[in-house]
Swiss-Prot record:
InterPro entries reported in the protein's UniProt record: AAA+_ATPase, ABC_transporter-like_ATP-bd, ABC_transporter-like_CS, Metal_Ion_Import_ABC, P-loop_NTPase
Gene Ontology biological-process annotations: response to zinc ion
Molecular function (Gene Ontology), one example: ATP binding
PROSITE patterns: ABC_TRANSPORTER_1, ABC_TRANSPORTER_2, ZNUC
Designated name of the protein: Zinc import ATP-binding protein ZnuC
Pfam (any one): ABC_tran
CDD domains: ABC_Metallic_Cations (cd03235)
Cellular localization per UniProt: Cell inner membrane
E.C. number: 7.2.2.20
The protein's assembly and partners: The complex is composed of two ATP-binding proteins (ZnuC), two transmembrane proteins (ZnuB) and a solute-binding protein (ZnuA).
Gene3D superfamilies registered for this protein in UniProt: P-loop containing nucleotide triphosphate hydrolases
Native source species: Pseudomonas fluorescens (strain Pf0-1)
Length: 261
């Protein structure tokens, strides 16, 4: 286990007698990017809570490197509109952070211009960068990013993915990222894990950045995107339970009614 930052083995979580997670095996190593994908209700948020230590599994184990430093970027930040909170004051909620450190973190993510702005006035894309800067202020060995590109168009996704890759390269941290997109993922992902209560399949993404039409559409950020092809050996019913019996015929092709997207 010495090479891993975090390792989950046979993790299961049950709510109201139903399995939300079942027999989950997952690990993240320094410098490794793992992207977690899956349909709504697949257990992605529950898995992130287990990784962060906010939820204890009903069975299985979650091992963390001793004194592991984790930087967490939530999907959204809900702030009372009447609360007088600037971006600087928000970042200084991290212990030991002063203005120079906050400014340096914002510069690293390209958002230094909002340092004195009220958090309520910052745009969605800028707020994502502020949340990423806050995660970096913890000098993390592991970055946990919960849908960092939610609500961002494909060009914006490519730009953010490129930024995350640069941060990984600069800091050498491991990255566990949750994505709402079941097929388009960050090209530098080392492993894609498809979750639907259990690990349905996993593998490497296929780069599409070499396609001239793709490059023309997304420019310099095209290499940040890749397609992930699912290779499921089973199916799920309408309740998300595994349908017993072997999968026969051609490899699974996703349709509009498919639980996996």
């Amino acid at each position: 286990m010495s090479d891993a930052l975090i390792r989950l083995e046979k993790v299961a979580v049950r709510f109201a007698g139903q399995n939300v997670l079942d027999n989950i095996h997952l690990s993240v190593e320094p410098g490794q990017i793992v992207t977690l994908i899956g349909p709504n209700g697949a257990g992605k948020t529950t898995l992130v809570r287990a990784v962060l230590g906010l939820l204890k599994p009903d069975s299985g184990s979650v091992w963390r490197k001793p004194k592991l430093r984790v930087g967490y970027m939530p999907q959204k930040l809900h702030v009372d509109p009447t609360l007088p909170l600037s971006v600087l004051r928000f970042l200084r909620l991290v212990p030991g952070v002063d203005r120079p450190r906050a400014l340096a973190a914002l510069k690293e993510v390209g958002a230094e211009h909002v340092i004195d702005s009220p958090v309520q006035s910052v745009s969605g894309g800028e707020m994502q960068r502020v949340l990423l800067a806050r995660a970096l202020l913890r000098e993390p060995e592991l970055l946990v990013l919960d849908e960092p590109v939610q609500g961002v168009d494909v060009a914006g996704q490519a730009e953010l993915y490129s930024l995350i890759t640069r941060l990984r390269d600069r800091h050498g941290c491991g990255v566990l990222m949750v994505s709402h997109d079941l097929h388009l993922v960050m090209s530098t992902t080392d492993q894609v894990v498809c979750l639907n209560r259990h690990v349905c399949c996993s593998g490497h993404p296929e780069q599409v950045s070499g396609d001239p039409a793709f490059v023309e559409l997304f420019g310099n950020n095209a290499p940040s995107l890749a397609i992930y092809h699912h290779h499921h050996d089973h199916a799920h019913d309408l309740h998300g339970s595994v349908v017993k019996g072997p999968v026969t015929g051609q490899p699974h092709v996703h349709g509009d009614s498919c639980k996996h997207g």
